[in-house]
Amino acid sequence: KGLGKVGAKKRHRRVIRENNQGITKPAIRRLARRGGVKRTLSGLVYDETRNVLKVFLESVVRDAVTYTEHAKRETVTALDVVYALKRQG
């Protein structure tokens, strides 16, 4: 009687196939320009950048979801993402 939400729900996580090719070559070039790269990039850089970006974003999303679950919410807020990014450094 009146126990409310006792624990975080075990959620089914969807398995996502390898689709990081969605990060296009021009998008990586724009990120590099914003980061201060002036010259053109080597062909090998793009796959490595996709892999690094994937690992970084997975970590940020994992932290943001952890903040959301700790607050016993089901919606990830912008602040959850901000705190997750701050935690990354």
From Swiss-Prot:
Core component of nucleosome. Nucleosomes wrap and compact DNA into chromatin, limiting DNA accessibility to the cellular machineries which require DNA as a template. Histones thereby play a central role in transcription regulation, DNA repair, DNA replication and chromosomal stability. DNA accessibility is regulated via a complex set of post-translational modifications of histones, also called histone code, and nucleosome remodeling. Keywords: Chromosome, DNA-binding, Nucleosome core, Nucleus. The nucleosome is a histone octamer containing two molecules each of H2A, H2B, H3 and H4 assembled in one H3-H4 heterotetramer and two H2A-H2B heterodimers. The octamer wraps approximately 147 bp of DNA. GO terms for molecular function: DNA binding; protein heterodimerization activity; structural constituent of chromatin. It holds the Pfam family CENP-T_C. It is found in: Nucleus; Chromosome. Gene3D superfamilies: Histone, subunit A (1.10.20.10). GO terms for cellular component: nucleosome; nucleus. PANTHER family: HISTONE H4. It comes from the Eukaryota. It comes from Blepharisma japonicum. InterPro entries: CENP-T/H4_C, Histone-fold, Histone_H4. This is Histone H4. Belongs to the histone H4 family.
